[in-house]
């Protein structure tokens, strides 16, 4: 499982700003009013191909035990108890407070690895600030100004050193021959019912009450001579609808499962169409770059007219992922399961396909000759060569000149061309564009004294004419 880092501290110390800086997003609402982050935000910090970890932005811990503030406090404590590393955030401008002392007291009871992070260090005397917080007894204190991105590189370096290679949760699977499939979707869409139908026995608790599955549950399966690990995840729902502390933390488990799976099966309810919650789940799968199969559940309960309407709606709402196969199923009655597994196999094989440098360069050459990049302000981007850079998803690095000016429409053309040429079905395709460095960029051509004299003689000759 991905390691988990929790940001914990009293209200308005800058946890959400740090979260946005680490995850390179604006997902956490940032405001000067204390207590703006009432729920937990979850994101993935991707430093490079090998270093990923989950970040949890908790609401500020307040003194109240009742009402919204009390619920926020319980959420923060739940996040801290599950974390592989806690970043205890304090405010350099306000200094230490009685509430900081109380938070530190229960953090020590948790016995989780904890790092003191002093935020808003800009405009303060850093030595004085460090002296004030020295009484907390941390062997090392990190100072940052998240709003100005000051000290973040040192923070990331320290976090990576302190995190385990794998999170404290159960490892999903390391068997390369076993396909890891995560069934994801909003609550009560039929994920547990589908897994139970595949297994042929009721291993998951399935009911009509949304949110019955509170954690991600993994079950091994052998079917038609192939091995699988099926992961039934808790449903991802709108934050305003997530009320219980236990259920809130299940979102972390779901995101970890998506990051660790090889193929994500997104389940939709044919009777309700594609909702905003479905789009949120789909976004999490796309952010992780996982192979995708869309399972349209409860298809058997639709009339012919309703099916036509549903097909039109699906083509409109899912038009931005035309590469993902969609399968019509009934989790309750088991129809469509064989085609679902075939789609999973195609997506898995495409996502993990290997390529030679020669074949991808031939593809780039044909794509370039068939449809060269358009001229932008009198200049044309040139694609020199390409090489494969990884799988799940298939990734290609394209080298050339003026690639920063390459239009998004042309990048989509390359993606579609490679997808069609190599028959890549059910998987995202990633392109990374790199320009060669110009050794003379930013340098001014300084003339020698002899060149200056020659230039003067030439100018006199021109003027004389």
Curated annotation (Swiss-Prot):
GO terms for biological process: ribosome biogenesis. One of its GO terms (molecular function) is GTP binding. Residues 353-437 form the KH-like domain. It comes from the Bacteria. Keywords: GTP-binding, Nucleotide-binding, Repeat, Ribosome biogenesis. Disulfide bonds: none annotated. It holds the Pfam family KH_dom-like. InterPro entries: G_ENGA (IPR031166), GTP-bd (IPR006073), GTPase_Der (IPR016484), KH_dom-like (IPR032859), KH_dom-like_a/b (IPR015946), P-loop_NTPase (IPR027417), Small_GTP-bd (IPR005225). GTP 2 binds at residues 185-192, 232-236, 297-300. The keyword GTP-binding applies. Residues 3-167, 179-352 form the EngA-type G domain. GTP 1 binds at residues 9-16, 57-61, 119-122. The keyword Repeat applies. HAMAP family: GTPase_Der. Associates with the 50S ribosomal subunit. GTPase that plays an essential role in the late steps of ribosome biogenesis. NCBIfam families: GTPase_EngA (TIGR03594), small_GTP (TIGR00231). Belongs to the TRAFAC class TrmE-Era-EngA-EngB-Septin-like GTPase superfamily. EngA (Der) GTPase family. This is GTPase Der. The gene is der.
């Amino acid at each position: 499982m991905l390691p988990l880092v929790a940001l914990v501290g009293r209200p308005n110390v800058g946890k959400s700003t740090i979260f946005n800086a680490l995850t390179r997003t604006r997902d956490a609402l940032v405001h000067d009013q204390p207590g703006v982050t009432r729920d937990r935000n979850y994101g993935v910090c991707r430093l490079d191909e090998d270093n990923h970890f989950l970040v949890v932005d908790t609401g500020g811990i307040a003194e109240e035990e009742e009402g919204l503030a009390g619920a926020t406090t319980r959420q923060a404590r739940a996040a801290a108890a599950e974390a592989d590393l806690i970043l205890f955030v304090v405010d350099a401008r306000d200094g230490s407070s009685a509430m900081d002392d109380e938070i530190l007291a229960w953090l020590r009871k948790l016995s989780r690895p904890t790092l003191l992070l002093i935020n808003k260090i800009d405009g303060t005397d850093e030595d004085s600030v460090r002296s004030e917080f020295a009484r907390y007894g941390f062997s090392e204190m990190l100072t940052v100004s998240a709003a100005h991105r000051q000290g973040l590189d040192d923070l990331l370096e320290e976090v990576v050193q302190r995190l385990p290679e794998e999170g404290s949760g159960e490892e999903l699977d390391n068997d390369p021959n076993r396909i890891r499939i995560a069934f994801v979707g909003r609550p009560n869409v039929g994920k547990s019912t589908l897994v139970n139908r595949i297994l042929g026995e009721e291993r998951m608790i399935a009911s009509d009450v949304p949110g019955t599955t509170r954690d991600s549950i993994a079950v091994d399966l052998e079917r038609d001579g192939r091995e699988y690990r099926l992961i039934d995840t808790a449903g991802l729902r709108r934050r305003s609808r997530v009320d219980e502390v236990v259920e809130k933390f299940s979102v972390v488990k779901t995101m970890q499962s998506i990051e660790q799976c090889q193929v994500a099966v997104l389940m939709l309810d044919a009777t309700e169409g594609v909702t905003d919650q479905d789009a949120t789940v789909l976004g999490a799968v796309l952010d992780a770059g996982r192979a995708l199969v869309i399972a349209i559940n409860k298809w058997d309960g639709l009339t012919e007219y309703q099916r036509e309407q549903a097909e039109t709606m699906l083509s409109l709402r899912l038009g931005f992922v035309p590469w993902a196969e969609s399968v019509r199923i009934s989790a309750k009655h088991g129809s469509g399961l064989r085609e679902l597994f075939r789609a999973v196999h195609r997506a898995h094989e495409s996502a993990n396909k290997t390529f030679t440098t020669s074949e991808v360069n031939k593809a780039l050459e044909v794509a370039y000759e068939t449809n060269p990049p358009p001229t932008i302000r009198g200049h044309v981007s040139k694609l020199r060569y390409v090489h494969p850079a990884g799988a799940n998803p298939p990734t290609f690095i394209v080298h050339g000149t003026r690639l920063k000016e390459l239009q998004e429409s042309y990048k989509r053309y390359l993606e579609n061309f490679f997808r069609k040429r190599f028959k890549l079905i059910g998987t995202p395709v990633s392109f990374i564009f790199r320009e060669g460095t110009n050794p003379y960029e930013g340098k001014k051509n300084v003339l020698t004294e002899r060149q200056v004299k020659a230039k003067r003689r030439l100018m006199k000759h021109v003027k004389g004419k």
